């Protein structure tokens, strides 16, 4: 419930503080006094668009604050808790507008984006403007009103989720198809590159291995000759070799040891050298025996190495890196093949998600049909009460799967006849301005009863209504005020007389500046204001008597 509205330096208001109560509050005033200023200020607290000229002339900024009691608003309390903005069972929505047009929003003293003001505002209050009857002719608004009356959000939420999933699947498939030409060109190039590489099939570490083998084979003649020369020096030479010389040396040292035992260590070293020379000689003999002098193998290696160097140069990599590069091309080719397969998967996902969205849309269609009949009958009854005794109202709900959107696949059309013998036609083609206003008001009152919003504002929605019809409208709003906080800006005494509270808006000027005031009326002042509304500027006994009748009704 809206508990208080504080306005500072807004439009022609310098300072204003208004306390609101439960029930129906009416706001009246002379033409041009600014009856809707409080509603405009509240709209800004709820995240409405701000302009620089909204700031009072001469002031640096306008400051607007709306205080709400959250006693019976669990949805708003949950929203505040989820956004970590809760502060007990009250909520302050504040808007500060600078003279340069910039503005800031606050919830319970914390700066927030305007989108959050709007989100929370929708849970706290609904504003029905004087042009609501114009919206009534628009199909999308008709759908909004029907869904608002149904007040069944689960299917709508699921419909939105399913539609978004389908829409994302369509975008994914379109993006995939858009890139398919690029992938096809790349796949063709890869196929050309891999044809030669597949035939060669480079293996990791192979180049280093065959390069070493090639060097060995290429130098095998020199390796054999040099190895044999070394072997001759160590053991196989006929004239002299290290083994025979060591043998002679050992004999001489043995004779010396007989004369001096200190030389026994020298003999040990010569024995060890003899063993080392023998082992080295054996190893060198085995090496010579194993040495491959196959010229065919040498040619094969030379061709393999030459081809790998050529391919590496062609692909701008080193010969050693060619196997890794080859593997990367194979992996990329596999990815492209997988992506080609994924197009079919994406297409299947589009079909699947579309069918799921249509399934929810059909369920939503059935729900709307059910509530459309119920709402149409209530509106028909209200039309009869609002001086349209022959009025009939229907709501057509047509399913069109080609019209699938986030809110389903229904085309909603409000149809009406106001005179006997006339066929049902779209509401925009049949109803006059006054009739449209009455029908719009009836719908707003009926749908408001079903919604959970704890406060409702009707800003001159009774335009085009007068006499007995106005009295019916006043009673409808008062009945609504028994269960919901209702605020109504009106110029009709029949409506104003139905309020539980009454505020009067006036303005005064000193010749240089104009200022708007708003005051709560006691019973006596209220009689005077109702009499003014009934008779114009002159209050007479008759108008006062009529005013008393309105208050007593």
From Swiss-Prot:
Induction (record text): Induced by hydroxyurea.
Ranges in coiled-coil conformation: none
Gene Ontology terms describing biological process: DNA damage response; double-strand break repair; double-strand break repair via homologous recombination; recombinational interstrand cross-link repair; recombinational repair; response to ionizing radiation; response to radiation; response to UV
Residues annotated as binding ATP: 29-36
Pfam hit, one: SMC_N
Gene Ontology cellular-component terms listed: bacterial nucleoid; cytosol
GO molecular function list: ATP binding
Disulfide bonds: none
Subcellular location per the Swiss-Prot or TrEMBL entry: Cytoplasm
InterPro entries per record: DNA_recomb/repair_RecN (IPR004604), P-loop_NTPase (IPR027417), RecF/RecN/SMC_N (IPR003395)
The entry's keywords: ATP-binding, Cytoplasm, DNA damage, DNA repair, Nucleotide-binding
Family: Belongs to the RecN family.
Protein known as: DNA repair protein RecN
Organism: Escherichia coli (strain K12)
């Amino acid at each position: 419930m809206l508990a208080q509205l504080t306005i500072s330096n807004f439009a022609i208001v310098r300072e204003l503080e208004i306390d609101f109560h439960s029930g129906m509050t009416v706001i009246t005033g002379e033409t041009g006094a600014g009856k809707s200023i409080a509603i405009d200020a509240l709209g800004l607290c709820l995240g409405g668009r701000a302009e620089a000229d909204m700031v009072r002339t001469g002031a640096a900024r306008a400051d607007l604050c709306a205080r709400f009691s959250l006693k019976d608003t669990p949805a708003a309390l949950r929203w505040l808790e989820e956004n970590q903005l809760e502060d007990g069972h009250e909520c302050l929505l504040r808007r500060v507008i600078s003279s340069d047009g910039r503005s800031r929003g606050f919830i319970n003293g914390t700066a927030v984006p305007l989108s959050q003001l709007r989100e929370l505002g929708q849970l706290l209050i609904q504003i029905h403007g004087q042009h609501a009857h114009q919206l009534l002719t628009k199909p999308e608004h008709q759908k909004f009103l029907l869904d608002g009356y149904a007040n069944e959000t689960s299917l709508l939420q699921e419909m939105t989720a399913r539609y978004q999933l389908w829409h994302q699947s369509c975008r994914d498939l379109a993006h995939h198809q858009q890139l398919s030409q690029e992938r096809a060109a790349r796949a063709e190039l890869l196929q050309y590159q891999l044809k030669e590489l597949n035939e060669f099939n480079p293996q990791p570490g192979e180049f280093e291995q065959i390069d070493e083998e090639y060097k060995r084979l290429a130098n095998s003649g020199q390796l054999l000759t040099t190895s044999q020369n070394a072997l001759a020096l160590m053991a196989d030479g006929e004239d002299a070799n290290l083994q025979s010389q060591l043998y002679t040396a050992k004999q001489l040292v043995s004779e010396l040891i007989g004369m001096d035992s200190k030389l026994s260590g020298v003999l040990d070293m010569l024995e060890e050298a003899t063993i080392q020379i023998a082992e080295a000689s054996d190893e060198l003999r085995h090496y010579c025996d194993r040495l491959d002098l196959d010229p065919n193998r040498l040619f094969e290696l030379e061709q393999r190495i030459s081809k790998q160097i050529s391919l590496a140069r062609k692909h701008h990599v080193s010969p050693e890196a060619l196997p890794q590069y080859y593997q990367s091309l194979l992996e990329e080719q596999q990815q492209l093949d997988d992506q080609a397969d994924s197009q079919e998967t994406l297409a299947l996902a589009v079909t699947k998600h579309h069918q799921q969205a249509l399934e929810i849309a059909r369920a939503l269609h059935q729900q709307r049909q059910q509530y459309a009949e119920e709402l149409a009958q209530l509106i028909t009854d209200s039309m009869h009460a609002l001086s349209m005794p022959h009025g009939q109202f229907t709501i057509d709900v047509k399913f069109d799967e080609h019209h699938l959107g986030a809110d389903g696949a229904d085309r909603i059309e409000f149809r009406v006849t106001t005179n006997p013998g006339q066929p049902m036609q779209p509401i925009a083609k049949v109803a006059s301005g006054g009739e449209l206003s009455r029908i719009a008001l009836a719908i707003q009152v009926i749908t408001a009863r079903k919604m959970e919003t704890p406060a409702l504002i009707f800003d001159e929605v009774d335009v085009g209504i007068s006499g007995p019809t106005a009295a019916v409208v006043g009673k409808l709003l008062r009945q609504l005020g028994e269960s919901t906080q209702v605020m109504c800006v009106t110029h009709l005494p029949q409506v104003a007389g139905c309020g539980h509270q009454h505020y009067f808006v006036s303005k005064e000027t000193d010749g240089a500046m104009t200022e708007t005031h708003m005051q709560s009326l006691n019973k006596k002042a209220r009689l005077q204001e109702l009499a003014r509304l009934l008779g114009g500027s002159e209050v007479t006994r008759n108008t006062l008597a009529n005013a008393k009748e309105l208050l007593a009704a």
